[in-house]
């Protein structure tokens, strides 16, 4: 017995002590994988900077984006006084791009948030209950998927009228089926797991199973898709504004700025270059961030 206790104590002494701060939580594992992706980290920093700029745009902008007019420098290019130049009405393009970030980013995020909320609910119901719930919801999604997203958005705005609020609604509508299908697929897989059967066996209600067990299992997929969908929504909102169906002049929305710049593209290309560059960099950043989140949350599908 003494020999046994001695050996047991020797084994315990040989085991390394694990301090509380050395315990690897899922969050630590996620952060460890994510910070190794330099492109995703750069994109994340850009998105954070963009959000800060959007929040404080009215205070950061050196000039009033809508009511400042420099009639002595119409269509002039970039200078120390006007970093991005001046448009045909004498407005400072740098100030308008900054304030446009506030409008374009808000439109993209709110549209995706609405689409994600409704789509997630429909996907949970379709995947969990199946039967006629599944058939009804999926047939509606099939109908919405039958139309190109921008065409569907144009139709919705044509009915509701122009304006940034209606653009958000239109973009949200064609985001709903994408989230519904994503969540439905995850729900169909999760509902077959043993922990779901265990929850049912102890009398958990359908609402409890959906909200406490199935929904948390779909969060990572939703977050990744949400991030990547923001870029698509920003492009869609800008496209509608470019067509004259979204934000109306003098609102400094990026798509509306491109629409106003069409007449001066030849003599003052900078008027269109900077809003277009803002759209490009923002969409690229959200896509790279989404890729990085996907690889960090589920390293098995990397590559």
Curated annotation (Swiss-Prot):
GO cellular component: ATP-binding cassette (ABC) transporter complex, substrate-binding subunit-containing; membrane; plasma membrane
A Pfam family this chain is assigned to: BPD_transp_1
CDD domains on file: TM_PBP2
Transmembrane intervals: 40-60, 105-125, 144-164, 165-185, 222-242, 266-286
Subcellular location field: Cell inner membrane
An annotated Gene Ontology molecular function: dipeptide transmembrane transporter activity
Topology within the bilayer: Multi-pass membrane protein
Record Gene3D superfamilies: MetI-like (1.10.3720.10)
Family membership: Belongs to the binding-protein-dependent transport system permease family.
Purpose: Part of the ABC transporter complex GsiABCD involved in glutathione import. Probably responsible for the translocation of the substrate across the membrane.
The protein's name: Glutathione transport system permease protein GsiD
């Amino acid at each position: 017995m003494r020999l046994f206790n001695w050996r047991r104590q020797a084994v315990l002494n040989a085991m390394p002590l694990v301090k509380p701060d050395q315990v690897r939580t899922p969050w630590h594992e996620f952060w460890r994988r994510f910070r190794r992706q330099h492109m995703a980290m750069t994109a994340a920093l850009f998105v954070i900077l963009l959000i800060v700029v959007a929040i404080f745009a009215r205070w950061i902008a050196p000039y009033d984006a809508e009511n400042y007019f420099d009639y002595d420098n119409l269509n002039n290019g970039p200078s120390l006084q006007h970093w991005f130049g001046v448009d045909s009405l004498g407005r400072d393009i740098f100030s308008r791009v900054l304030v446009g970030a506030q409008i374009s980013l808000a439109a993209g995020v709110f549209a995706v948030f609405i689409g994600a909320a409704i789509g997630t609910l429909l996907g949970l119901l379709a995947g969990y209950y199946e039967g006629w719930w599944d058939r009804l919801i999926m047939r509606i999604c099939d109908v919405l998927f039958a139309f190109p997203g921008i065409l569907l958005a144009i139709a919705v705005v044509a009915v509701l009228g122009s304006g940034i609020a209606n653009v958000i609604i239109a973009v949200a509508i064609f985001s709903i089926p994408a989230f519904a299908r994503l969540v439905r697929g995850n729900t169909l897989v999760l509902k077959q797991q043993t922990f779901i059967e265990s929850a049912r066996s102890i009398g958990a209600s359908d609402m409890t199973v959906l909200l406490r067990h199935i929904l948390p299992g779909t969060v990572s997929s939703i977050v990744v898709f949400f991030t990547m969908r923001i870029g698509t929504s920003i492009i869609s909102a800008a496209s509608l504004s470019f067509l004259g169906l979204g934000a109306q002049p003098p609102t400094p929305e990026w798509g509306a700025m491109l629409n106003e710049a069409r007449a001066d593209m030849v003599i003052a290309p900078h008027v269109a270059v900077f809003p277009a560059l803002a759209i490009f960099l923002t969409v690229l950043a959200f896509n790279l961030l989404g890729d990085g989140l996907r690889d960090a949350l589920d390293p098995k599908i990397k590559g």
